[in-house]
Amino acid sequence: MVNVLKGVLIECDPAMKQFLLYLDEANALGKKFIIQDIDDTHVFVIAELVNVLQERVGELMDQNAFSLTQK
């Protein structure tokens, strides 16, 4: 029997990949979303969760960014 899943290949740096692996292990999106961990910079994820992943990555980037007015 063949199971077919629609997915998206994501290329990122190793640090971002570790964040994605953390989200996957913690079931932060309600279910596992990584279909295949390919190598150091690539993961294959469920296509329907890509928008949610982009939001989570955006939140992480906002937390790590500093504005010029902050001291």
Curated annotation (Swiss-Prot):
Positions carrying Phosphothreonine are 69
Check the record and name the Pfam families matching this protein: Tfb5 (PF06331)
| InterPro entries xrefs | TFB5-like_sf, TFIIH_TTDA/Tfb5
According to the UniProt record, one GO cellular component term is: transcription factor TFIID complex
The answer on whether this UniProt entry bears the keyword DNA repair reads yes
List the disulfide bonds in this chain. Answer: none
* Gene3D superfamilies for the chain: TFB5-like
Q: What is its main location?
A: nucleus
- Looking at the keywords, is Nucleus present? yes
Sorted alphabetically, the keyword list is:
Cytoplasm, DNA damage, DNA repair, Host-virus interaction, Nucleus, Phosphoprotein, Transcription, Transcription regulation
UniProt-listed GO biological process terms: cellular response to gamma radiation; maturation of SSU-rRNA from tricistronic rRNA transcript (SSU-rRNA, 5.8S rRNA, LSU-rRNA); nucleotide-excision repair; nucleotide-excision repair, preincision complex assembly; transcription elongation by RNA polymerase I; transcription initiation at RNA polymerase II promoter
Cell compartments where the protein resides: Nucleus; Cytoplasm
Protein's job: Component of the general transcription and DNA repair factor IIH (TFIIH) core complex, which is involved in general and transcription-coupled nucleotide excision repair (NER) of damaged DNA and, when complexed to CAK, in RNA transcription by RNA polymerase II. In NER, TFIIH acts by opening DNA around the lesion to allow the excision of the damaged oligonucleotide and its replacement by a new DNA fragment. In transcription, TFIIH has an essential role in transcription initiation.
The UniProt entry's sequence similarity note says:
Belongs to the TFB5 family.
Subunit info here reads: Component of the 7-subunit TFIIH core complex composed of XPB/ERCC3, XPD/ERCC2, GTF2H1, GTF2H2, GTF2H3, GTF2H4 and GTF2H5, which is active in NER. The core complex associates with the 3-subunit CDK-activating kinase (CAK) module composed of CCNH/cyclin H, CDK7 and MNAT1 to form the 10-subunit holoenzyme (holo-TFIIH) active in transcription.
Q: Under what name is this protein listed?
A: General transcription factor IIH subunit 5
**Which source organism does the UniProt entry give?**
Mus musculus
Name of the encoding gene: Gtf2h5
